[in-house]
Amino acid sequence: MVVERFKNSDAAAVYRRFQDKGRMAPEGLLYVSSWVDDKLERCYQLMETADRSLLDEWMANWSDLVEFEVYPVITSKEAAERIAAGAGAERKPA
């Protein structure tokens, strides 16, 4: 999950560049979806890649307009599987 904060609260500059140049994501970095807060100050974007350097490359293309925070995330299903696997290992026989 990528949290983008538009510098100077200038979402318009970000959207202008997007219209002119597209997402500018390198091959191997997949855009999934995004949500923008109603104040047009932050974007919460889900990207997917096995190679963190591709994410860094993409962020460098936007770093003059956007500040980034990156949070590795997994699906709820994956979280449940991890928890179940851990809980199963901790159970003691009766």
Predicted regions: what is each one?
Residues 1-42, 50-54, 74-94:
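Short S/T/G/P-rich N-terminal loop/turn motif that feeds into the first structured element of a domain
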Residues 59:
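Short, flexible helix/strand-to-coil boundary loops that buttress conserved ligand/catalytic motifs
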Residues 65-77:
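Conserved short beta-strand edge segments in small beta-sheet-based binding/regulatory domains
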Residues 13, 56, 66-69:
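Secondary-structure transition/capping residues
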